[in-house]
């Protein structure tokens, strides 16, 4: 626990021994106590103590239900508890309370919706976060919106968002790789090849990126380039799923 948290906990504990200065002071004390309990809930969540995390976040909400941090923390906690309806409700409440002034609330709610809820809604929230002048990394929100749209079976929308991410950070690895997949799946292998090359210039190769490069060159009929990718896959990622797929493919071809 941080020194700041300990200090606030001590201050809240002392309130029981001191007379309150009126309703305004009481509200201020509740807000401070809610902030402490929300922070403690996160600490317990990191320790996988879900029961304690739930107790603390419920207390925080009781003390200050209009706290964006408490509502977001409740979203985290109930998500981990597998209570998706409650988690969604708390994320939505955080977004309503924060408006456009807290892109983090928008982003957190969007991540949840894309993973467990309404992907279209998640995509909309990511775009709202990207449009916020307070969000310093809109390219991340565009990338996430692209991943959400792709998971929802809308590659054209995904491509648009990935390109918007690259317009802000041209060497951002994940959008480059995702665009390579989208172009390969659409049969545009020349564009797919270019995106794979840009990805390998921007980030270390992965089993996934090498396998994609191999698949592109194989489809293009470039046996030499395909074999070079196959060699790298065997050497650099021998235990990967992709290396297993390559082995199965080569065995069937014999």
Model features per residue range: what roles?
Residues 32-63, 80:
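Alpha-helical segment of the N-proximal tetratricopeptide repeat
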Residues 39, 73, 107-108, 142-144, ...:
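Canonical tetratricopeptide repeat
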Residues 31, 65, 99-100, 134-136, ...:
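Short coil turns that delineate tetratricopeptide repeat
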Residues 25-33, 201-254:
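Terminal, low-structured helical/coil segments at or just beyond the last alpha-helical repeat
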Residues 70, 105, 139-141, 175, ...:
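TPR alpha-solenoid repeat register
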């Amino acid at each position: 626990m941080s020194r700041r948290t300990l200090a606030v906990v001590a201050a809240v504990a002392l309130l029981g021994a001191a007379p309150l200065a009126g309703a305004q002071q009481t509200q201020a004390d509740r807000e401070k106590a809610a902030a402490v309990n929300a922070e403690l809930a996160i600490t317990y969540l990191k320790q996988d103590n879900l029961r304690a995390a739930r107790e603390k976040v419920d207390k925080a909400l009781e003390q200050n239900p209009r706290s964006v941090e408490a509502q977001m923390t409740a979203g985290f906690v109930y998500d981990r508890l597998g209570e998706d309806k409650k988690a969604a409700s708390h994320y939505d409440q955080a977004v309503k309370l924060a408006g456009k002034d807290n892109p983090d609330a928008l982003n957190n709610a969007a991540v949840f919706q894309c993973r467990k809820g309404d992907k279209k809604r998640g995509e909309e929230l990511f775009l709202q976060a990207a449009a916020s002048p307070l969000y310093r990394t809109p390219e991340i929100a565009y990338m996430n919106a692209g991943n959400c749209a792709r998971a929802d079976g809308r590659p054209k929308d995904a491509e648009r968002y990935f390109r918007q991410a690259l317009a802000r950070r041209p060497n951002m690895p994940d959008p480059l790789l995702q665009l390579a997949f989208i172009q390969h799946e659409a049969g545009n292998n020349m564009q797919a090849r270019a995106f794979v090359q840009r990805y390998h210039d921007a980030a270390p190769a992965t089993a996934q990126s090498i396998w994609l490069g191999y698949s592109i060159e194989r489809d293009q009929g470039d046996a030499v380039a395909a074999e070079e990718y196959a060699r790298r896959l065997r050497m650099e990622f021998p235990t990967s799923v992709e290396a297993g797929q390559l082995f199965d493919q080569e065995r069937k071809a014999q």
